[in-house]
Structure formats: C-alpha cells, structure tokens
Amino acid sequence: MIQPQTLLNVADNSGARKLMCIRVIGAAGNQRYARIGDVIVAVIKDALPQMPLERSEVIRAVIVRTCKEFKCEDGIIIRYDDNAAVIIDQKGNPKGTRVFGAIAEELRELNFTKIVSLAPEVL
C-alpha cells in the first residue's frame, strides 16, 4: 500500500531512480492508499545525469510492485521485495523503453498493455 511520502524505486529506464509519492489518484475516486495498477503523482528524488527527467520534477506513475501482499482472483497471494512504479505520460504510455523486474498480470486488465508488453516477466 502506497501513501503520500512513500519512497518508490523506478522500474524503467526513463532516467529517474527514486520517486516520492505526493498524491494518490487511484483508479476510482478519492483513495488514501495506492495498490498495484493505481496511478499516483510523484516527485523525482534521484535521477541519472544527462537524462530528460530531472530531480524535483513532478510526474505521473503507475504502481507495478508493492511490498504489501495482494490476492489474485485465483487465490494466489503475491508479495514483492520492493515498492516500484513505472513513469507514464498523461495518456498512460510509459516514458521509458524498458521495464525491469516482474510485474503483476492485473495491469493487463487495467489497460496498461504497453507496460505489460515491455516487462520481462508477468506474474
């Protein structure tokens, strides 16, 4: 569960390394916590030099991994080692061209198919 002030890793090659959540937009209405597949507004806390994204830039991101476990529809419980997000634009397309690490299959159902197609492993 991601809430404001939570630090997240970036799971793509857009140039940012660490994000801090400042607002949970979510999939439906006013939510306090973000789960896998929810959209957040975040600020970049750490970035690589000579990349298009800079430190202290406000961006949108979609949550792809959380430490808090969640139950799939088939009853399997999935838990990841870190909190991670993929940076997206206003239309929901990823800014990076690669996605690192495994992501959940629930993103496919939430119409983030471009992120799912870039991922090396879908659980």
From Swiss-Prot:
Tell me the GO molecular function terms: large ribosomal subunit rRNA binding; structural constituent of ribosome
Cellular component terms (Gene Ontology): chloroplast; cytosolic large ribosomal subunit
**Name of protein:** Large ribosomal subunit protein uL14c
**Keyword RNA-binding carried by entry:** yes
Give its localization: Plastid, Chloroplast
Question: Which NCBIfam families does the entry link to?
Answer: rplN_bact (TIGR01067)
Which InterPro entries would you find in this protein's record?
Ribosomal_uL14, Ribosomal_uL14_bac-type, Ribosomal_uL14_CS, Ribosomal_uL14_sf
Source organism per UniProt: Hordeum vulgare
Q: Which HAMAP family match?
A: Ribosomal_uL14
Name the protein family. Belongs to the universal ribosomal protein uL14 family.
Name the UniProt key words of this record, in alphabetical order. Chloroplast, Plastid, Ribonucleoprotein, Ribosomal protein, RNA-binding, rRNA-binding
Q: What gene makes this protein? A: rpl14
Q: Which residues form a coiled coil?
A: none
Q: What is its main location?
A: plastid
Q: Which domain of life is it from?
A: Eukaryota
Assembly and partners? Part of the 50S ribosomal subunit.
Record keywords: Acetylation included?
Answer: no
**Free-text function comment from the UniProt entry:** Binds to 23S rRNA.
Q: Which GO terms describe its biological process?
A: translation
